[in-house]
Amino acid sequence: MKIDIVSVFPEYFEVLNLSLLGKAQEKGLVEVTAHNLRDWTHDVHHSVDDTPVGGGAGMVMKPEVWSECLDELLHLEPTTVTCDSMVTCDSTADADDTASADAAEPAESATEIAANADTVPATDRPVLIFPNPSAPLFTQQDATELSHANHLLFGCGRYEGYDARIPQYYRAQGVDVREYSIGDYVLNGGEVAVSVMLEAITRLLPGFMGNAASIVEESYTGENALLEHRQYTKPADWRGIKVPDVLLSGDHAKVDRFRRDEALAKTNELRPDLIEALDCSKLDKADRKTLMALGWEVSGAHPRQR
């Protein structure tokens, strides 16, 4: 996978040379290049921003600089967008369209990720990604989909963000443009968000993890996603706190059931919206019993609280 990152602080991404992502680069699984957006400026101050049209606080990143950079990295010739090819500049419409498209994609199970990652066809079409706190939330499903791409290009915004016409223009050129939020909060720039998305995406690549099965039971993973059960290691009794006896029983069926029940209970407490999204037809008898004890009705298509 080829990964390009555009930022006014490219040195921020030196951290990507550490840990598993650094090893993945050494093995040739991923090629990461961080570019300085100021390299595409032409003024003495290397300016990348200007005041907002219509007034307001802060500065907005200029489309001229971004377009020269992105045209070069995407191997595109500059052009003028016509009315026929113009896409809406309404951010709500764009977000709704993106969310609808994401919702239409079926979630891939964790087992399929681990077992069939080598057989999933990759796409040669580059994907241009901008972090944006006003965009749809980046999810594990998005990470799974993007892990099948051959080329990802991330643009890191700063100040009040980037000119809204930048993603608009490249969508009109047929580029697959994604805008994602990583949570209901605002950062100083897109670098942190890009690092988060990169780690979520690249760890799903075949050969990235030492044990591919380790991603199977993680939180948010799979078709009927739950939060992961709690994890313990040795010693079994630490400072007076003991691990649950069932985990020491050696009975794998009981251990699996305990962990499943704990995942259901934890998800019920912290993320009941994930319980509501479960497919009741894929719950076994023990799942149903646990959910009913937690106050859920499981006779319909999806659980609902009593």
Curated annotation (Swiss-Prot):
> Primary place of residence?
cytoplasm
Q: Where in the cell is it found?
A: Cytoplasm
Catalytic reaction(s) noted: guanosine(37) in tRNA + S-adenosyl-L-methionine = N(1)-methylguanosine(37) in tRNA + S-adenosyl-L-homocysteine + H(+)
Any idea of its EC number? 2.1.1.228
Q: Give UniProt keywords alphabetically.
A: Cytoplasm, Methyltransferase, S-adenosyl-L-methionine, Transferase, tRNA processing
Disulphide connectivity of cysteines: none
GO MF annotations in UniProt? tRNA (guanine(37)-N1)-methyltransferase activity
Q: Which Pfam families match?
A: tRNA_m1G_MT
This entry carries the following GO cellular component terms, namely: cytosol
- Binding of S-adenosyl-L-methionine, residues: 157, 182-187
Q: What class of enzyme is it?
A: transferase
For this entry, list what GO says about its biological process.
tRNA N1-guanine methylation
The record's listing under NCBIfam families reads: PRK00026.1 (NF000648)
Relate the protein's function as given in its record. Answer: Specifically methylates guanosine-37 in various tRNAs.
Fill in the subunit field for this protein. Homodimer.
User: Which family would the database say this protein is a member of?
Assistant: Belongs to the RNA methyltransferase TrmD family.
What is the protein named? tRNA (guanine-N(1)-)-methyltransferase
Question: Taxonomically, what lineage is the organism?
Answer: Bacteria, Bacillati, Actinomycetota, Actinomycetes, Bifidobacteriales
Q: Which gene encodes it?
A: trmD
